[in-house]
């Protein structure tokens, strides 16, 4: 659905309010306000809408990768439920900041137990716990008791990236909905609407680069576009500008590295990749992440390919725990040399 910016800009009472809105980050400026503005997960919104219409809304658990619309969806649902009473009937907490048991005992319990006297047809309040996977296990256990005690007057929506970090006792008390990464076509349509409103020109290669780097994360896509547009002089965004601003290696750079890894000797491949890394300021972690997409396209025996991917995962893990990039670059070149030798023996 197209974003109607005319409705948003006409509601401002003063120029200050208008300027404040215009200066917002794009992720907040274009955050969906109602269910019709959401671009994906129609099955989830339809199910929850039906539950609301039947007055059978349970406690909710939204989980999935970041930037897929979890928080926006529950906020849109809350606006549908409460309208002008939103601020009085909804408590929003970011559990990554307030993650201890004191929050459960004080803020959550106080809000859940308080009476409400507003003119609303909805017989319950709503507590939204964002990034709840950051809560301690003790706090989650205490929250379980609060949910049990105040179910008649309060509904809870637990939002997290990793459902495995939510204790089973909490999971069993909620209806779970998984938010998958956003599909490319509707994401591209929404991004084109936004860049048109912002008077930014993005060529097709640059748009493909944003979608590739975003990996179904709308927040990441918008942050990339806004960052690059701010660094652009004429508001023209190119593929090269996207990769230069984000620090990710360009596909042409990765193709060059793959050629060195497969055809050059150890010393030459190591030196060439090391020089390219320094020249373009690339991270080996980003190189590994992008490299695996190219590796699966190489014509190698399946057993050898599996070993190569296993080596790449070991390198990625070693980097995550602080191992030397130079040492792991040597390991990267070495594992390709071994794969080449194995392929020769296999043939």
Swiss-Prot record:
GO annotation terms (biological process): DNA repair; DNA-templated DNA replication; leading strand elongation
SMART domains xrefs: AAA (SM00382)
Residues the record lists as binding ATP: 64-71
GO molecular function: ATP binding; ATP hydrolysis activity; DNA binding; DNA clamp loader activity
The UniProt record lists the keyword Nucleus: yes
SUPFAM superfamilies in the cross-refs: P-loop containing nucleoside triphosphate hydrolases, post-AAA+ oligomerization domain-like
Keyword tags: ATP-binding, DNA replication, Nucleotide-binding, Nucleus
Main location: nucleus
InterPro entries, A to Z: AAA+_ATPase, ATPase_AAA_core, DNA_pol3_clamp-load_cplx_C, DNA_Rep/Repair_Clamp_Loader, P-loop_NTPase, Rep_factorC_C, RFC_lid
CC per GO annotation: DNA replication factor C complex; Elg1 RFC-like complex; nucleus
Protein's UniProt keywords contain Nucleus: yes
Subcellular locations according to the entry: Nucleus
Stated family: Belongs to the activator 1 small subunits family.
Complexes and interactors: Heteropentamer of various rfc subunits that forms a complex (RFC) with PCNA in the presence of ATP.
Function field: The elongation of primed DNA templates by DNA polymerase delta and epsilon requires the action of the accessory proteins PCNA and activator 1.
UniProt name for this protein: Probable replication factor C subunit 5
Natural source organism: Dictyostelium discoideum (Social amoeba)
Encoding gene (name): rfc5
């Amino acid at each position: 659905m197209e974003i109607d910016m005319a409705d948003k800009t006409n509601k401002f009472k003063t120029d200050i309010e208008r300027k404040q809105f215009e200066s917002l980050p794009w992720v907040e400026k274009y955050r969906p306000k109602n269910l019709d503005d959401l671009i994906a997960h129609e099955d989830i919104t339809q199910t929850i809408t039906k539950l609301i219409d039947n007055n059978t809304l349970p406690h909710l658990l939204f989980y999935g990768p970041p930037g897929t619309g979890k928080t926006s969806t529950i906020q849109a649902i809350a606006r549908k439920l409460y309208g002008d009473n939103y601020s009085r009937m909804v408590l929003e907490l970011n559990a990554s900041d307030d993650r201890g048991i004191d929050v459960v005992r004080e803020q959550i319990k106080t809000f859940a137990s308080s009476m409400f006297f507003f003119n609303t047809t909805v017989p319950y309040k709503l507590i939204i716990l964002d990034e709840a996977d950051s809560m301690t296990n003790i706090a989650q256990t205490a929250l379980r008791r609060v949910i049990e005690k105040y179910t008649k007057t309060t509904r809870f929506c637990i939002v997290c990236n990793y459902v495995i970090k939510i204790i089973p006792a909490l999971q069993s008390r909620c209806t779970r909905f998984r938010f998958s990464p956003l599909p490319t076509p509707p994401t591209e349509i929404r991004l084109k609407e936004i860049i048109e409103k912002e008077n930014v020109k993005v060529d097709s290669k640059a748009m493909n680069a944003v979608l590739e780097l975003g990996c179904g994360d709308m927040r990441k896509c918008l942050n990339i576009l806004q960052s690059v547009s701010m660094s652009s002089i004429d508001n023209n965004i190119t593929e090269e500008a996207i990769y230069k601003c984000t620090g990710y290696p360009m596909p042409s750079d990765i193709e060059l590295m793959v050629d060195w890894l497969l055809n050059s000797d150890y010393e030459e491949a190591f030196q060439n990749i090391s020089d390219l890394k320094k020249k373009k300021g690339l991270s080996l972690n980003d190189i590994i992440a992008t490299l695996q997409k190219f590796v699966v396209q190489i014509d190698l025996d399946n057993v050898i390919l599996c070993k190569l991917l296993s080596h790449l995962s070991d390198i990625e893990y070693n980097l995550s725990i602080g191992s030397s990039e130079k040492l792991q670059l040597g390991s990267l070149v070495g594992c390709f040399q071994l794969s080449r030798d194995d392929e020769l023996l296999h043939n």
